[in-house]
Regions:
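Conserved acidic segment of CheY-like receiver
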Residues: 2-12, 18-22, 50
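Output/docking surface of receiver
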Residues: 74-117
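Conserved phosphotransfer microenvironments
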Residues: 52-70
Length: 117
């Protein structure tokens, strides 16, 4: 069974590309465009990780990261501006560093989380 990744983004161009990269890397992608939809998925389904685009406003990002933290689901924020603002995410990755850096960071985060479970 492929690990499921919740991908949250309101971006119309970048989100499908990012989701295709995740799927090509072997992840089952659950794409959503709103925080409310993301929170609903987190309450109803098993998710291995959360990927949050920079397009999600910081207060909304904080809500999702907090819910993920409570459920012990690691989260990665794709953030070229490094706006951490105490959002409880596990990791911030600059998407301009390329898909390999993003995928490596996600894989190492999920492996670390799996070892601590």
């Amino acid at each position: 069974m492929r690990p499921s990744v919740l991908s949250i983004s309101a971006e119309r161009v970048l989100a499908p590309i990012r989701n295709a990269v995740l799927a090509h890397a072997g992840y089952g992608v659950i794409p959503v465009s709103t925080v409310e939809a993301a929170l609903s998925i987190l309450r109803a389904r098993h998710v291995c990780a959360i990927v949050i685009a920079n397009s999600v406003p910081i207060p909304e990002r904080r809500r999702v990261c907090s819910e993920g933290h409570n459920k012990r689901i690691p989260s990665v924020v794709l953030d070229p501006y490094d706006q951490r603002d105490e959002d409880e995410s596990e990791l911030h990755v600059n998407p301009l560093d390329g898909p390999e850096v993003f995928l490596d960071a996600l894989a190492s985060l999920m492996q670390r989380d799996h070892r601590h479970a």
